[in-house]
Every structure is written in C-alpha cells, then in structure tokens.
Curated annotation (Swiss-Prot):
This is Proton-associated sugar transporter A. GO terms for molecular function: D-glucose:proton symporter activity; galactose:proton symporter activity; sucrose:proton symporter activity. Belongs to the glycoside-pentoside-hexuronide (GPH) cation symporter transporter (TC 2.A.2) family. GO terms for biological process: D-glucose transmembrane transport; galactose transmembrane transport. It catalyses: D-galactose(in) + H(+)(in) = D-galactose(out) + H(+)(out); D-glucose(out) + H(+)(out) = D-glucose(in) + H(+)(in). The gene is Slc45a1. The chain crosses the membrane at residues 93-113, 123-143, 155-175, 191-211, 233-253, 268-288, 536-556, 576-596, 606-626, 630-650, 688-708, 710-730. It is a multi-pass membrane protein. The lineage of its organism: Eukaryota, Metazoa, Chordata, Craniata, Vertebrata. Predominantly expressed in brain. It comes from Rattus norvegicus. Keywords: Membrane, Phosphoprotein, Sugar transport, Symport, Transmembrane, Transmembrane helix, Transport. Proton-associated glucose transporter in the brain.
C-alpha cells in the first residue's frame, strides 16, 4: 500500500530534524522525532507523581575513522612474536659463557694444586670474584635499566662482560706459561699462581655477570608469550654449552698430533673456548634489535585527543504538565559522572577505523587499544572534558550557565599531557570555559593507578530543574552512542602513561642510597625467592667447583701433589678427565630437561618442579659418597642437570609473573616502582653469595674430613633444606588486586 503524499515516512518520523546545536535548547513541545513511553507505577518505586514521558531517540550512524599520524604512534610496549631462530640466537651467549665456565670449573683447581697452592687456600680462589659480583651486580643491573646508548640498554653490557671473560680466560689457561716467561722456576710458580688467580677472578665475575643482561635483554624484546620460551631456550643453550665444554676438556689432547702441535692440553682448550665465546657473543648481539632508552630529560612525542565533537545528548525528561518552555533566568547545573559498563571487547564498542595505512601518514590504532592499558585513557578523558572547543560540553548562550564542578581521581605523580594537558598541582585546577569556571578537583583514592575509563560504567546524569529554587533530582539515563564514540576516540589515541613515559621522566638519577633503599624495601615474594635461590646455588656450587677433585681423589684414589711420574699423580689426572665426562653428562641432562620443562609446566605446578629438582639433587650427591663404582657415580650426574636447569629457569619465570601484578611493580608516584634489571640482579646475587660461603666453608671442611667427601655431604644437606623452603615459603602466585573497589569508584563525581 502506497502512503499518501502528505504523510511522513516512518523512517523520517523516527529521526529528529533538529540541528545538533538545538539539542541543549530549552525543550519545547515540538520534538517531533521522539517516541513517547509511559513509566509504570512499579518502575517508579510506587511513588505518586504526574505521569512522565520518556523520549527515545535512535542512535546515529557509526562514526568515521579516527585517524592519527603513524609516526606518533608509540609501539614500544608492543612486541611481535619472536621466531625460534631469533630466540635461539638470542641465547647463544649462554652457550659461550657456559662453555668457558666448564673449562674454568674443570681445570682451575687441578692447575692451582699442581702449581703448589696449599689445600687450605685453594678454595679461597673462588672468594674474590663472588664478593665483587655481590657488590657490583645490583649496580650493573640498575645501570643497564637506565643506559641510554644507541645500541640499547643491555647489549653494551653483554659486549663488555664477554670481553672481560675472554681476557680472564686468557690469563687462566696461560698463566703458568706467562709466569715461566717472567720469573718463575720449576719449583716456584708465584707469578703463575698470581696471574691464574687474577684470571679466575675476572673470568668468573664476567661470566656470571653476563647472565643478567642477557636475561633482561630477552625479556625486554619479547612479549609475555615468548618470555617462557626464551628462558627455556636460554637454559637449553647453557646446558649444551657446558656439555660441549666438558667434552672438549675430557679429551686427552696431549696424546693427539693436533694437541702436540698447538702446545698441549691447556693451549687447545684455550683456542676452542676463545673462538666459541667470540662467535656466540656476536650471534647474540645481532639477534634481535633493541630499542634505545630515551634520555632522562627527553619527552616522547605524545598525541592530542582528536577534536571530533561527540553527538549531543537527547533532551531532558520533563514531568507531564510542566510548562512547555523554561524561563531564561532559570539556573542550569550540569552534573557528570560515569557508571555504565564499557570494555574494549564489548559488543557496544565496534572497531570503527581499524585500518592501518602505510601509504599515507594516517592510521587508526584501535586494534592496539587493548594493549595500551587503561591508565593511558584517563589523561585523554580529562583532556576531552576540559578542552574549550569541545562542542558536546557547550551550552547555548540563551541559557545562563553556572560553575561546573567536576572531581577527578587524583592523577599519579609525574602525570602530564603535553602542550595542553594537565599539570601537577597541589590544589584543584580551575579552567575557563567561555567565561565560566570549570573546577577540576582531586579525589583521594586508594588505587590511583586503577582509574581507567574502560573499567568503569558510564552514565550521564542530567537533573531536571522545575524552577530556580526547586528540588533537583538525579535521575540517570544511558547514553549508548556517546559511550561508544568516547570509547573509540579514547582508545584510538595513546597518551603518556604511568607505566611508560611519565614514570620514566619522573625517576630520580641513580644513586647508591636509592639502590640500597630498593634492596632494603625488597618485597616479601622476592626476598623468599632469593633465599630459595641462594640455597639452590649453595648446594650446586659446592658440588660443581670440586667435582673433578672429588673424582680424582675419592673415586680414583689419586694425589694431585704426588710427583708427576708417580702412579698416584696419573690416577688423579685420569679422575679429573673422567670428572669432565661426568660434568658432560650433567650438562646434557640439563639441556634435555630444559627442552621438556615447558611441557612439564603444563602438567605439574612450579612448586612440584622445584621440590623434585632439590630432592633429586640431594639424593644424587648423597649416594655419590656411598658408592665407589664409576658407573653409578656417573649416572647420578643426570640429577645435577635437573637442578641446574631449574635454577636457570623457574626463578626468573616467577619474577616475570610477579611483574604482571600492578601492586608488585609499584609506581613512581609513591616511589615504590621497581626495575626488572635490579630484581634480576638481586636474584643473581644469590649465586655470588653462595659462592662466597662455599669458598669460606668447604676448604676447612675438606681438611677436617680428610677428603672431598665433605663437599658432597654439604651439598646434599643444603639441597634437602631447599626442598623444605621451596615447599613452605616461596610465593608462587600473587593475588590480583581487588577489583570491587575499582568498580565502585566512579570516574567523575558530583561536587
């Protein structure tokens, strides 16, 4: 049926024909596009009142794309998924370091004992480097967090420490020859001992310190998905490096023509180790590009919120029977608060403008809104609601306006919006709006970082005013389209946030006092994790540093101080070589366990994996002292690799999990923000602390027991202690902050 010519089509009857600037005009009876609906008695809480009409206006069409220049988009927090080869090359430095460390642990003690170092002093060789590491490791971690080199934050430290390890290795394996060239004799090797000890200190400190920037380097350039894979690959490369290192050290190069041509066993080992360390360092440095850190005083380019006006709101609900017009002298007050749910994945928020145009300088970045976090949105919201040219807050000149008082949550310290944003102030901020006053106050909130717009509901409350002194009601209605547009606009722009730019700018320069304060105020989860890490390294280092000596003296019944032509001396050398093969078994078992550890984490909890590693190591070291069978002792080396892989992987994985908690990470606003480089260094310092204790205790313990059996007893006892501590004291999950307070706290409050 064709409608008559004079009738209005149904589609046009639903769409208002009033200009956008007339929506804030005093409502009159001619709002032809509205649909009338009566509110029931029950819906009004059974109150007596004149009948009211509710006007419903359909939402306008979807908004256009919200473009922004791509050069202003900050992709620093967005890490692409790394391939296996990128992670493999990134972990090559661990292969070279462990290859070098295998040579050090296998030959330092035999070389020093053969040069005449007393039994009571040979364990003190390991005392100097861990003290330096314990004192300097946190400083290196803090400096790497703040390094502004154009090569990145971590790679300069990796390069310097790799060079230091190479120099130490040169002194370690060639110290005896250099001493003979200086002033040593066949019976007096004082210069050789001194140079060898200096090489041990430099090599040990550099090799152990290189682990921390390499781990931090991987965590900086990888997202959370790739961090666990990267840690497992690091442990795998470390195990393979140690395994091949012990294989090279276990071969009798003196009996080969290649070894005789190069000058002997130690010379061949030095050449292999130097080449391996140099090549793997280069592979790591070129593996993944690292973004340089901005200098402290430099502000990153931030984008302003787009000046696209939001559509005006529908007219205010009026009681039936009220006048058709409002007197021009009636005071109008606007109260705004947000309380209706909006979230990025909500169907209320269609992804308009989700295109990326590399051809021009404009692109929409709504696809990345979910990764920017909610703390980036608040500054945009404040800027949108305080800008003088925003049309959706403008009132027509026909209606006199009064002061609009809006209270925002307190902005974190260091918060700023460039060029036209808010600055930090002690009191409320007052802005002019065409002669009016907009007072922006501050609200004391217990969680200032949790003030994101996407976590709060939104409504717009417009009070009905019947007269100048009449009572005001605070009925609220949902403005769905405005919510959608606000969400799109605010998600389409990335501002400075507390976790990125503003916090970096507000940080104070590094000082020893501030570093000591960070260590002193260490959170309890990190403190317990460090103690557990210390127990693990204490037991492991006691076995590792003296295992070849244990094989030569206890299993093979040799004597390192016997004459070189004696049978006891030859037995000791055979035991040292066989100890290298035992360490090779341990290293390859560590590599294999690292390869399957990711699958085991899907089946077993981290607590269970910790317990199993400590338990097997305690059983392995304890049983090794009870048996003299070579095959039994070598088979027990597989247990040692499980603990090594665990110590190289699980503590750092737990630390990454800790940093997923906002409460743990802290903020620069209250001075509680922590750097991951510092915490990684604090965790790695437990290795140095364990090595200090081992060097002080195991020498006298070995002399008291009369053999190297005391070392294995000590390692077994400490490992069982670690079993109990990892089960009872370590924090494996930090509970998330209570979101209820966050939802109850509105973003904008009436004043």
């Amino acid at each position: 049926m064709i409608p008559p010519a004079g009738s209005t089509p149904p589609g046009e009857a639903l769409i208002p024909s009033v200009a956008p600037q007339d929506f804030w005009r005093s409502p009159i009876s001619g709002y032809s596009g509205s649909v009338t609906r009566h509110i029931s008695h029950r819906a009004n809480n059974f109150k007596r009142h004149p009948k009211r009409r509710k006007y419903i206006r359909p939402s306008p069409p979807p908004p256009p794309n919200t473009p922004c220049p791509i050069e202003l988009v900050d992709f620093e927090d967005l890490h692409p998924q790394r391939s296996f080869w990128e992670l493999l090359f990134n972990g090559c430095i661990l292969f070279g370091i462990e290859f070098s460390y295998a040579m050090e642990t296998a030959y330092v003690t035999p070389v020093l004992l053969q040069m005449g170092l007393p039994d009571q002093l040979y364990s003190l060789v390991w005392f100097i480097s861990p003290i330096l590491g314990f004192l300097l490791q946190p400083l290196l971690g803090a400096w790497s967090d703040r390094c502004t080199s154009r090569f990145g934050r971590r790679r300069p430290f990796i390069l310097v420490l790799a060079i230091g390890a190479l120099l130490g290795l040169s002194l370690l394996l060639n110290g005896r020859d250099i001493g003979m060239a200086l002033a040593d004799t066949a019976t007096n090797h004082k210069w050789g001992i001194l140079l060898t000890v200096c090489g041990v200190v430099l090599m040990d400190f550099s090799a152990d310190s290189a682990d921390n920037p390499s781990h931090a380097y991987m965590m900086d350039v990888c997202g959370p998905v790739d961090q666990d894979r990267g840690l497992n690959i690091h442990a795998l490369m470390a195990g393979l490096g140690g395994g091949f290192g012990y294989v090279v050290g276990g071969i009798h190069w003196d009996k080969t023509s290649f070894g005789r041509a190069l000058g002997g066993q130690l010379r061949v080992i030095y050449i292999f180790t130097a080449i391996t360390l140099s090549v793997t360092t280069v592979f790591t440095l070129v593996s993944i590009p690292e973004r340089p850190l901005r200098p402290l005083g430099e502000k990153r380019t931030a984008m302003k919120s787009p000046s696209l006006p939001l559509p005006p709101s529908p007219p205010v609900l009026l009681e039936e029977g009220a006048g058709d017009t409002l007197p021009s002298t009636t005071a109008t007050s606007l109260y705004a608060s947000f309380s209706s749910p909006i979230s990025p994945p909500s169907p209320l928020t269609p992804k308009y403008g989700s295109f990326i145009s590399r051809d021009s300088s404009l692109t929409g970045i709504n696809e990345f809104a979910s990764s920017f976090g909610t703390s980036n949105i608040d500054s945009v919201l404040i800027d949108c609601f305080t800008a003088g040219h925003d049309n959706y807050l403008a009132l027509p000149s026909s209606v006199p306006r009064q002061a609009i008082s809006v209270s925002f949550p307190r902005a974190p310290d260091g918060f700023y919006c460039q060029e036209r944003g808010l600055e930090r102030r002690e009191g409320p901020l007052t802005l002019g709006l065409d002669g009016d006053v907009l007072r922006v106050g501050s609200l004391d909130t217990s969680k200032p970082r949790a003030s994101g717009i996407l976590k709060r509901p939104q409504t717009l409350a417009l009070p009905d005013v019947a007269g100048g002194n009449g009572p005001e009601t605070s009925r609220r209605r949902n403005v769905t389209f405005s919510q959608q547009v606000a969400n799109i606009l605010l998600n389409g722009v990335k501002y400075e946030s507390e976790l990125t730019g503003s916090s970096e700018q507000s940080e104070q320069p590094l000082s020893l006092r501030r570093l000591c304060s960070t260590i002193y105020n260490m959170p309890r989860p990190v403190r317990n994790l460090c103690v557990n890490h210390f127990l693990g390294w204490l037991s492991f280092e006691g076995m590792l540093l003296f295992y070849t000596d244990f094989m030569g003296e206890v299993v093979f019944q040799g004597d390192p101080k016997a004459p070189h032509a004696s049978e006891a001396y030859q037995k000791y050398n055979s035991g040292v070589t066989m100890g290298c093969w035992g360490m090779c078994i341990y290293a390859f078992s560590a590599a294999f366990y690292s390869a399957i550890l990711e699958k085991l984490e899907e089946c077993l909890s981290v607590r269970t994996l910790y317990f199993i590693a400590y338990l097997l190591f305690g059983l392995g070291t304890g049983l090794a002292t009870l048996s003299r069978n070579l095959y039994v002792v070598l088979s027990l080396c597989t247990h040692y690799g499980i603990l090594f892989s665990t110590l190289c992987t699980l503590p750092y994985s737990l630390l990454c999990d800790y940093y997923q908690s906002k409460k743990f990470a802290g903020s620069s606003a209250d001075g509680t923000r922590r750097g991951m480089g510092v915490d990684i260094s604090l965790l790695s310092c437990q290795y140095f602390l364990a090595q200090i204790l081992v060097s002080l205790v195991l020498g006298p313990l070995t002399s008291a027991v009369g053999s190297a059996n005391g070392v294995m007893y000590f390692a077994s006892l400490v490992s069982f202690l670690g079993c109990l501590y990892s089960s009872l004291c370590v924090t494996y999950e930090i509970p998330s902050a209570d979101a209820a307070d966050e939802e109850r706290q509105p973003l904008l409050l009436n004043v």
